[in-house]
């Protein structure tokens, strides 16, 4: 049973027996706070919400980067302010509202969460280089982390390369972990990201340093961001292209998992993914590496509609029929991906897989494929051209919305006219030859002494109708 006593109610209970008393004692006990080791004896953090006078003026000067005012106030010993003064930017009133809300749910929170920072952190996060230099000259500790992050973490996450340089020269540790187990190298973002990363590496940051929980390296993060230049920089500094995180993901897997945010970004997203994958493969990344769920780069590239990446991976000889932990092949992933992937031309992905020996879709699933991908008639075309007959029920026409039927009238008229009807002799010859070459299709077809047009026909070239 969940106890919901407040500290006052606990004190009123007297001395209950057993576990209840122990729990009550723990509730009223002052909790340990990791930040207290950073505070001077007898002093607590300065609450910004209640600050006034020189303290408030000092805080505002740091925020705007007014180095003159910061210097003047620090020079006045009567203010009691120091370069390492700790400020609490949290809102106690907001906590009180939250506390009363959770009490209504029969829960109890003993203390509110402090949000601690120092002038050094604020200056670093806002790019105030002169204020930063002043504070460091006045003996501010570069690795102070009352809130769980150092000033170097803040400067890197904001992409302020000049501040990163100042802190590193002052002796900041480039490999220290923040409260989330991340190093400065993992947090680099913003316009100065490349310069920040290079500075960290020059000052001894571990190029393959891992995060504490996920065990991700900076190269994993560069791949997830789709940042080709950052990945290239890390690889030139010796980053391992096949390093795995705690779930078995390699940077190549992370790159193939890049998702398109909107149809307008489809081309740019696929291009970034392609450039990243080509870069990683060029330095020896395993094109067929699988994570803990047995997902391979080809599964992910197919699921997200990265057709150029699919071609690249297939050219490396990856298995077009490998199954993930759920029993899905790359072709399944391509057809199970979001229908918004139509902007990525899924028909090219499906055709490339089939031309590299992918096992065809079970005929009984074709109505579901038609229902899902009817807005991409070329995807339907390339699938249907791998069967000797159109294996659809007569009522399948009802699966296609009228507006799609009207838009692609020529193709869908030819499709439904062939339901339970014989296909052309030309098509049957294609099926027979492809079946005969099964297992060596991608290597054998290009070697056949055939005219280019006939070769394209055998490789399921798009014609926008069926016969």
UniProtKB/Swiss-Prot annotation:
**SMART domains for the chain:** ANK (SM00248), SOCS (SM00253), SOCS_box (SM00969)
Asked whether the keyword Metal-binding is assigned, the reply is no
Q: Which residues form a coiled coil?
A: none
- GO annotation (BP), single: protein ubiquitination
Top-level division of the source organism's lineage: Eukaryota
A cellular component term from Gene Ontology for this protein is: nucleus
Could you tell me which residues the ANK repeats occupy? 115-144, 147-176, 180-209, 214-243, 247-289, 293-322, 326-361
InterPro entries (UniProt xref): Ankyrin_rpt, Ankyrin_rpt-contain_sf, SOCS_box, SOCS_box-like_dom_sf
Q: Which UniProt keywords apply?
A: ANK repeat, Cytoplasm, Nucleus, Repeat, Ubl conjugation pathway
Compartments (UniProt record): Nucleus; Cytoplasm
Task: List the pathway annotation.
Answer: Protein modification; protein ubiquitination
Note on domains (UniProt) = The SOCS box domain mediates the interaction with the Elongin BC complex, an adapter module in different E3 ubiquitin-protein ligase complexes.
Please report which protein family the annotation says this sequence is part of: Belongs to the ankyrin SOCS box (ASB) family.
Q: Supply the name of the protein.
A: Ankyrin repeat and SOCS box protein 10
Native organism: Mus musculus (Mouse)
According to the entry, what is the taxonomic lineage of the organism? Answer: Eukaryota, Metazoa, Chordata, Craniata, Vertebrata
């Amino acid at each position: 049973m969940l106890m919901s006593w407040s500290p006052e109610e606990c004190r009123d209970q007297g001395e209950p027996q057993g576990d209840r008393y122990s729990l009550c004692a723990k509730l009223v006990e002052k909790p340990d706070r990791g930040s207290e080791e950073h505070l001077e004896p007898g002093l607590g953090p300065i609450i910004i919400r209640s600050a006034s006078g020189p303290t408030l003026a000092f805080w505002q000067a740091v925020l705007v980067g007014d180095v003159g005012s910061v210097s003047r106030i620090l020079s006045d010993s009567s203010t009691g302010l120091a370069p390492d003064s700790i400020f609490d930017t949290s809102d106690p009133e907001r906590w009180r509202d939250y506390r009363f809300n959770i009490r209504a749910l029969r829960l109890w929170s003993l203390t509110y969460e402090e949000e601690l920072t120092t002038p050094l952190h604020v200056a670093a996060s806002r790019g105030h280089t002169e204020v930063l230099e002043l504070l460091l000259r006045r003996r501010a500790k570069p690795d102070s982390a009352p809130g769980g992050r150092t000033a170097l973490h803040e400067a890197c996450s904001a992409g302020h390369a000049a501040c990163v340089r100042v802190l590193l020269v002052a002796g900041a540790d480039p490999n220290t972990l923040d409260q989330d187990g991340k190093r400065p190298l993992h947090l680099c973002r913003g316009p100065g990201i490349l310069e920040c990363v290079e500075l960290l590496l020059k000052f001894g940051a571990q190029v393959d340093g891992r995060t504490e929980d996920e065990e991700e390296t900076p190269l994993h993060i560069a791949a997830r961001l789709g940042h080709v230049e950052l990945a290239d920089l890390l690889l030139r500094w010796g980053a391992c292209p096949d390093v795995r995180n705690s779930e078995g993901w390699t940077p190549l897997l992370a790159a193939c998992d890049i998702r398109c945010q909107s149809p307008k970004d489809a081309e740019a997203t696929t291009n970034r993914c392609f450039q990243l994958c080509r870069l990683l493969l060029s330095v020896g990344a395993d094109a067929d590496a699988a994570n803990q769920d047995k997902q391979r780069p080809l599964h992910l590239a197919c699921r997200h509609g990265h057709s150029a990446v699919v071609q690249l991976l297939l050219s490396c000889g990856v298995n077009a029929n490998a199954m993930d932990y759920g029993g899905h092949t790359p072709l399944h992933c391509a057809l199970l991906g979001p229908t918004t992937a139509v902007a990525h031309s899924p028909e090219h992905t499906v055709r490339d897989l089939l031309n590299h020996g992918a096992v065809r879709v079970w005929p009984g699933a074709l109505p579901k494929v038609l229902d899902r991908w009817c807005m991409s008639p070329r995807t339907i075309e390339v699938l249907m051209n791998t069967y000797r007959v159109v294996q659809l029920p007569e009522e399948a026409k009802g699966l296609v919305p009228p507006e799609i039927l009207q838009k692609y009238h020529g193709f869908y008229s030819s499709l439904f006219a062939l339901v339970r009807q014989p296909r052309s002799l030309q098509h049957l010859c294609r099926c027979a030859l492809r079946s005969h070459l099964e297992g060596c299709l991608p290597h054998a077809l290009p070697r056949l002494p055939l005219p280019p047009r006939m070769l394209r026909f055998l490789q399921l070239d798009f014609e926008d109708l069926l016969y």
